[in-house]
Amino acid sequence: MQTVTVIIEYIQKHLSENITLAELAKEANYSISYICSAFRSVMNKTINNYIKEKRLDLAVQYLKADIPITEAAEQAGFNNYSYFYKTFKSVYGISPVEYRNRTLQENDER
């Protein structure tokens, strides 16, 4: 469990940066295969899926703050806009642009 805590803390501190499994393994002082297995057994998801979820959560916060979409993607740690767009749409069912428009519309209605 302590290994997973170390990994989660590292991810939180470096979310907007490129994070590799090798870096995480070095930070936790274990092999890549061990940290992947330990993380999956505790969190019921892969490290990469966890990172993706956290980056999407951060991107949503930026979109709600009316930060430009490409900048929101970049600040959330997505280095490739098309990957961000595809990932966002697959998780939320709408594009980042549609999400932003709905959020702004909801705010206007309040």
Regions found by a protein language model. Give the residues of each.
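Short coil turns linking two alpha-helices in DNA-binding domains
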Residues: 31-32, 79-80
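Short, structured helix-loop boundary elements
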Residues: 1-4, 21
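Terminal helix-turn-helix DNA-binding modules in bacterial transcription factors
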Residues: 9, 13, 18, 22, ...
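…primarily DNA-binding HTH/wHTH and HhH modules…
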Residues: 86-110
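Catalytic donor nucleotide-activated moiety binding site of glycosyltransferases and closely related
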Residues: 28
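Short hydrophobic/aromatic patch on the recognition helix
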Residues: 35, 39, 83-84, 88
